[in-house]
Amino acid sequence: GEQDVVSTILQADMDRLRHTNEHLAREAFSGAVEALLQARCIYVLGVRSSAALASSLSYYLHYMFETVRLITTPSTSEVFEQLVRISPQDAVIGISFPRYSTATGKALQYCREAGAQVIALTDSETAPIARSAHYLLTAKSDMVSLVDSLVAPMSVVNALIVALTSRRKHETAQTLERLEQVWDQYHVYEKVHI
Protein backbone atom coordinates (compact mmCIF):
# COMPACT_ATOMS: atom_id res chain seq x y z
CA GLY A 1 0.00 0.00 0.00
CA GLU A 2 0.88 3.69 0.09
CA GLN A 3 2.32 3.41 3.63
CA ASP A 4 4.80 0.84 2.32
CA VAL A 5 5.83 3.20 -0.49
CA VAL A 6 6.57 5.98 2.02
CA SER A 7 8.65 3.68 4.24
CA THR A 8 10.48 2.17 1.28
CA ILE A 9 11.40 5.53 -0.25
CA LEU A 10 12.43 7.14 3.04
CA GLN A 11 14.56 4.13 3.98
CA ALA A 12 16.22 4.13 0.56
CA ASP A 13 16.99 7.85 0.90
CA MET A 14 18.50 7.28 4.35
CA ASP A 15 20.71 4.58 2.82
CA ARG A 16 21.79 7.00 0.07
CA LEU A 17 22.64 9.64 2.69
CA ARG A 18 24.68 7.12 4.67
CA HIS A 19 26.55 6.01 1.53
CA THR A 20 27.23 9.64 0.55
CA ASN A 21 28.54 10.48 4.02
CA GLU A 22 30.91 7.50 3.92
CA HIS A 23 32.22 8.12 0.39
CA LEU A 24 32.30 11.90 -0.09
CA ALA A 25 35.96 12.98 -0.32
CA ARG A 26 36.47 15.59 2.40
CA GLU A 27 39.62 17.00 0.72
CA ALA A 28 37.63 17.63 -2.46
CA PHE A 29 34.86 19.23 -0.41
CA SER A 30 37.34 21.57 1.33
CA GLY A 31 38.97 22.39 -2.00
CA ALA A 32 35.59 23.21 -3.51
CA VAL A 33 34.79 25.56 -0.62
CA GLU A 34 38.15 27.36 -1.06
CA ALA A 35 37.68 27.64 -4.83
CA LEU A 36 34.25 29.21 -4.35
CA LEU A 37 35.55 31.61 -1.70
CA GLN A 38 38.37 32.79 -4.00
CA ALA A 39 36.27 33.14 -7.16
CA ARG A 40 35.54 36.50 -8.75
CA CYS A 41 32.37 35.05 -10.28
CA ILE A 42 30.62 31.77 -9.45
CA TYR A 43 28.73 29.95 -12.18
CA VAL A 44 26.21 27.31 -11.10
CA LEU A 45 25.17 24.91 -13.84
CA GLY A 46 22.48 22.24 -13.68
CA VAL A 47 19.85 21.23 -16.21
CA ARG A 48 16.71 19.09 -16.15
CA SER A 49 16.29 17.46 -12.71
CA SER A 50 19.65 18.93 -11.60
CA ALA A 51 18.24 22.44 -12.18
CA ALA A 52 16.45 22.22 -8.81
CA LEU A 53 19.77 21.60 -7.04
CA ALA A 54 21.49 24.38 -9.00
CA SER A 55 18.68 26.83 -8.23
CA SER A 56 18.80 26.10 -4.52
CA LEU A 57 22.59 26.48 -4.35
CA SER A 58 22.50 29.68 -6.39
CA TYR A 59 19.73 31.16 -4.22
CA TYR A 60 21.87 30.89 -1.08
CA LEU A 61 25.14 31.87 -2.77
CA HIS A 62 23.53 35.22 -3.65
CA TYR A 63 23.41 36.03 0.08
CA MET A 64 27.18 35.60 0.35
CA PHE A 65 28.69 36.57 -2.99
CA GLU A 66 28.20 39.53 -5.30
CA THR A 67 28.47 37.74 -8.64
CA VAL A 68 26.65 34.42 -9.01
CA ARG A 69 25.32 33.21 -12.35
CA LEU A 70 22.74 30.42 -12.53
CA ILE A 71 22.53 28.43 -15.76
CA THR A 72 19.66 25.96 -16.08
CA THR A 73 18.84 26.00 -19.79
CA PRO A 74 19.01 22.57 -21.45
CA SER A 75 20.13 24.24 -24.71
CA THR A 76 23.84 23.55 -25.27
CA SER A 77 24.28 26.71 -27.37
CA GLU A 78 22.65 28.87 -24.66
CA VAL A 79 24.85 27.29 -21.98
CA PHE A 80 27.96 28.29 -23.94
CA GLU A 81 26.58 31.79 -24.57
CA GLN A 82 26.27 32.24 -20.80
CA LEU A 83 29.74 30.80 -20.08
CA VAL A 84 31.69 32.52 -22.84
CA ARG A 85 33.23 35.12 -20.46
CA ILE A 86 34.42 32.62 -17.84
CA SER A 87 38.05 33.20 -16.83
CA PRO A 88 40.77 31.76 -14.58
CA GLN A 89 39.52 34.04 -11.76
CA ASP A 90 36.15 32.27 -11.79
CA ALA A 91 34.73 29.00 -10.50
CA VAL A 92 31.96 26.82 -11.85
CA ILE A 93 30.01 24.12 -10.08
CA GLY A 94 28.35 21.72 -12.49
CA ILE A 95 25.67 19.33 -11.28
CA SER A 96 24.73 16.26 -13.30
CA PHE A 97 23.10 12.95 -12.45
CA PRO A 98 21.85 10.12 -14.68
CA ARG A 99 20.71 10.59 -17.32
CA TYR A 100 23.73 12.81 -17.74
CA SER A 101 23.29 16.05 -19.67
CA THR A 102 25.72 16.35 -22.57
CA ALA A 103 25.39 20.16 -22.28
CA THR A 104 26.77 20.09 -18.72
CA GLY A 105 29.63 17.78 -19.68
CA LYS A 106 30.72 19.89 -22.65
CA ALA A 107 30.34 23.12 -20.67
CA LEU A 108 32.56 21.92 -17.82
CA GLN A 109 35.21 20.79 -20.30
CA TYR A 110 35.13 24.30 -21.82
CA CYS A 111 35.40 25.91 -18.35
CA ARG A 112 38.40 23.75 -17.47
CA GLU A 113 40.13 24.67 -20.74
CA ALA A 114 39.38 28.36 -20.01
CA GLY A 115 41.31 28.01 -16.73
CA ALA A 116 38.38 28.27 -14.31
CA GLN A 117 38.18 26.17 -11.15
CA VAL A 118 35.76 23.33 -11.86
CA ILE A 119 33.67 21.62 -9.19
CA ALA A 120 31.49 18.67 -10.18
CA LEU A 121 28.62 17.27 -8.13
CA THR A 122 27.60 13.91 -9.56
CA ASP A 123 27.01 10.30 -8.59
CA SER A 124 30.38 8.65 -9.30
CA GLU A 125 34.00 8.97 -10.37
CA THR A 126 33.03 7.54 -13.77
CA ALA A 127 30.33 10.14 -14.51
CA PRO A 128 31.04 12.21 -17.64
CA ILE A 129 31.55 15.50 -15.74
CA ALA A 130 34.06 13.92 -13.34
CA ARG A 131 36.78 14.13 -16.03
CA SER A 132 36.72 17.94 -16.08
CA ALA A 133 36.63 18.45 -12.32
CA HIS A 134 39.37 19.85 -10.13
CA TYR A 135 37.11 18.97 -7.19
CA LEU A 136 34.77 15.99 -7.47
CA LEU A 137 31.87 15.73 -5.02
CA THR A 138 29.93 12.48 -5.25
CA ALA A 139 26.46 11.82 -3.89
CA LYS A 140 24.38 8.68 -4.26
CA SER A 141 21.41 9.13 -6.57
CA ASP A 142 19.29 6.36 -8.05
CA MET A 143 16.28 6.33 -10.27
CA VAL A 144 13.17 5.47 -8.28
CA SER A 145 10.63 4.51 -10.95
CA LEU A 146 10.14 7.83 -12.80
CA VAL A 147 11.97 10.18 -10.41
CA ASP A 148 15.61 10.72 -9.52
CA SER A 149 16.27 10.70 -5.79
CA LEU A 150 18.06 13.99 -5.15
CA VAL A 151 18.03 13.79 -1.35
CA ALA A 152 21.75 12.99 -0.95
CA PRO A 153 22.87 15.54 -3.58
CA MET A 154 20.71 18.19 -1.88
CA SER A 155 22.35 17.34 1.42
CA VAL A 156 25.79 17.94 -0.15
CA VAL A 157 24.49 21.28 -1.50
CA ASN A 158 23.31 22.15 2.04
CA ALA A 159 26.73 21.22 3.46
CA LEU A 160 28.44 23.50 0.93
CA ILE A 161 26.12 26.37 1.85
CA VAL A 162 26.74 25.90 5.59
CA ALA A 163 30.53 25.65 5.09
CA LEU A 164 30.57 28.81 2.96
CA THR A 165 28.27 30.70 5.33
CA SER A 166 30.54 29.93 8.27
CA ARG A 167 33.45 31.46 6.31
CA ARG A 168 31.47 34.51 5.12
CA LYS A 169 29.49 35.36 8.26
CA HIS A 170 30.03 39.12 8.00
CA GLU A 171 28.99 39.40 4.33
CA THR A 172 25.96 37.18 4.86
CA ALA A 173 24.84 39.13 7.94
CA GLN A 174 25.19 42.46 6.09
CA THR A 175 23.16 41.22 3.14
CA LEU A 176 20.40 39.84 5.36
CA GLU A 177 20.29 43.07 7.38
CA ARG A 178 19.88 45.16 4.22
CA LEU A 179 17.25 42.75 2.88
CA GLU A 180 15.24 42.92 6.10
CA GLN A 181 15.14 46.72 5.77
CA VAL A 182 14.03 46.52 2.13
CA TRP A 183 11.44 43.86 2.90
CA ASP A 184 9.99 46.01 5.70
CA GLN A 185 10.04 49.21 3.66
CA TYR A 186 8.36 47.65 0.62
CA HIS A 187 6.10 45.24 2.52
CA VAL A 188 7.50 42.22 0.69
CA TYR A 189 6.28 39.76 3.31
CA GLU A 190 3.13 39.67 5.40
CA LYS A 191 3.71 40.06 9.12
CA VAL A 192 1.74 37.60 11.15
CA HIS A 193 1.19 38.57 14.77
CA ILE A 194 0.68 35.61 17.05
Kindly give the residue locations of the regions a language model identified.
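HTH-adjacent hinge/linker in prokaryotic transcriptional regulators
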Residues: 1-27
